[in-house]
């Protein structure tokens, strides 16, 4: 295993157990079997390695969601299952739960709201493609599909910019909005 991968493996282990705030670079380096100075040959900061770990973990968990959910079921049921699955997988994951931690949230939100982050986010790309294909198959006009995807982009924007500190119960509120939006479209 190369040194960068050893750092990532050690960081994943430590962040998974302790969370972001309680983890130090010295502990990651020690667990990887290298000096702290060597850490900086591969990552410029704790934030940088955490972002790398977070992206990998988010992709892994979201891929599991893609594989586990039935994307052909009734849209209202699908939205409900999508939110429930996301809550279940994120709430018990110390790495993904850091999305709401003010100490690192800005870094994570900044990455995922950037064009690079959107393009490199396979779950986001999957949702856009899957919902677009489904709407096309159901006979929605290109204009209606664009309008609906614009609302999806608003939900994505809210996820990137509104935290629980800004708006208590934001996740539940977004779920209610999404569910009722879909109900309105299907009428």
Give a label for each model feature:
Residues 180-187:
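C-terminal alpha-helix
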Residues 98, 135-180:
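Hydrophobic/aromatic-rich alpha-helical bundle segments in the mid-to-C-terminal region
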Residues 6, 10, 14-48, 52:
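Helix-turn-helix
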Residues 88-112, 160-164:
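Amphipathic alpha-helical segments used for helix-helix packing
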Residues 60, 85-93, 155-158, 162, ...:
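Phosphate/oxyanion-binding loops and surfaces in catalytic or ligand/nucleic-acid-binding neighborhoods
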Residues 62, 108-139, 143-147:
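Amphipathic alpha-helical packing segments from all-alpha helical-bundle domains
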Residues 52, 56, 66-92, 149:
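Hydrophobic alpha-helical connector segments
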Residues 46, 53, 57, 61, ...:
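Hydrophobic/aromatic residues within well-ordered alpha-helical segments
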């Amino acid at each position: 295993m190369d040194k960068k991968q050893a750092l990532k493996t050690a960081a994943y282990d430590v962040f998974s157990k302790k969370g972001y705030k309680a983890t130090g670079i010295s502990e990651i380096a020690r667990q990887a079997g290298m000096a702290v100075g060597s850490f900086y040959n591969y990552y410029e900061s704790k934030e940088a390695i955490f972002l790398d770990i977070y992206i990998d973990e988010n992709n892994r968990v979201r891929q599991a969601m893609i594989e586990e959910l039935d994307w052909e079921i009734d849209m209202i049921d699908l939205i409900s299952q999508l939110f429930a699955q996301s809550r279940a997988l994120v709430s018990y994951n110390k790495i993904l739960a850091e999305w709401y931690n003010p100490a690192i949230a800005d870094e994570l939100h900044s990455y995922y709201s950037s064009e690079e982050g959107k393009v490199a986010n396979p779950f986001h790309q999957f949702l856009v493609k899957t919902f677009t294909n489904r709407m096309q198959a159901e006979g929605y006009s290109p204009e209606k599909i664009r309008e609906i995807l614009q609302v999806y982009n608003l939900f994505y924007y809210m996820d990137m910019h509104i935290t629980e500190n800004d708006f208590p119960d934001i996740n539940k509120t977004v779920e209610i909005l999404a569910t009722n939006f879909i109900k309105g479209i299907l009428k």
